[in-house]
A protein has these predicted regions:
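Conserved class I S-adenosyl-L-methionine
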Residues: 1-31, 43-47, 66-69, 86, ...
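Local beta-strand N-terminus motif with an aromatic residue
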Residues: 31, 99-101, 127
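Class I SAM-dependent methyltransferase SAM/SAH-binding core
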Residues: 35-37, 41-92
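Conserved Class I S-adenosyl-L-methionine
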Residues: 41-43, 166-266
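A short acidic, Gly/Pro-enriched loop at the edge of an enzyme's catalytic core
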Residues: 90-102
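A short SAM/SAH-binding and catalytic strip from SAM-dependent methyltransferases
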Residues: 102-115, 136
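Conserved catalytic/acceptor-binding region of the Class I
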Residues: 116, 127-197, 212
Length: 266
């Protein structure tokens, strides 16, 4: 997949940042060191510094564009290019022997194939706390329509099957992480965001969940000049406008998030 766009991702930074604040608020212990898995453009680092000003921090992300943006925005921070699976296996920039008191991740693990099976290994890299949130909206109209439109002609031959990301319910995450010596707090929240402007749901999902589809269409257009991306945006945008009608105050978007905080017992 082509790289992410930090600018597009940050268009709704307040709405995207809110779950991270809720996640951080549920961390009970004070870490001396923090690893942020999937740190993105570094826009959430201030929340960590504000909560734990003396902690050492490392942000990891698999996107070169995101790491470049994070380093430019926060030159005093440490941001490294790394894959979540490498970190779980102890092959990343943070040696397994060093670990971190807090390993935290916001809206990243849903992109990792087999992330449910990877959770115990990720938790093992945390000396005190492993905390994460993932979007739980993959059955929402936005994502269902993405699969339907992308799965129809003429897009399906270009983008291939659109995967439904395997995100579990809070009870499932509790079951996976509740090993001896761990205390787990798992919950879910549905936010109702009010998005301004024209086609805001299309702009929202185009920066995140629709990325694999859009990158495939853009690559095809670059090679063949077919204009499939514009046609897809028109068809998908029309379906989203019907599913998420604009009101006088903006366009409401219900967005479910699932959280888990696993803490080693004292």
């Amino acid at each position: 997949m082509a790289d992410w766009s930090p600018a597009a991702y940050l268009r709704y930074t307040d709405e995207r940042s809110r779950p991270f604040g809720e996640l951080v608020a549920r961390v009970r212990r004070d870490p001396a060191s923090i690893v942020d898995l999937g740190c993105g453009p570094g826009h959430l680092t201030p929340a960590l510094r504000e909560r734990w000003p003396g902690a050492m921090f490392v942000g990891l992300d698999a996107s070169p564009a995101m790491i470049e943006r994070a380093r430019a925005t926060d030159p005093e921070g440490r941001y490294e290019l790394a894959d979540v699976r490498d970190h779980a296996a102890g092959r990343g920039p943070v040696p397994a022997a060093d670990g971190a008191d807090l390993v935290i991740s916001n809206a990243t693990l849903q992109w990792v194939p087999g992330h449910l099976e990877l959770l115990p290994a990720l938790a093992a890299t945390a000396r005190q706390t492993f905390a994460f949130s993932v979007p739980g909206n993959h059955d929402a109209p936005s994502h269902r329509l993405l699969r339907e439109v992308a799965g129809g002609a003429p897009f399906a031959d270009v983008v291939g099957p659109v995967e439904r990301r395997a995100v579990a319910d809070p009870a499932d995450y509790l079951e996976i992480l509740a090993a001896p010596g761990w205390e787990v707090d798992a919950w879910e929240t549905t936010y109702t965001h009010v998005l301004p402007g024209e086609d805001p749901v299309l702009r929202w999902i185009s920066a995140t969940g629709a990325q694999p589809v859009l990158h495939a269409l853009d690559a095809h257009d670059a090679a063949h000049g077919t204009g499939l991306r514009a046609r897809f945006d028109a068809e998908y945008g029309a379906a989203l406008r019907e599913a998420y009608p604009r009101r006088g105050y903006g366009t409401p978007l219900a967005f479910r998030r699932v959280f888990a905080v696993a803490t080693r017992a004292d």
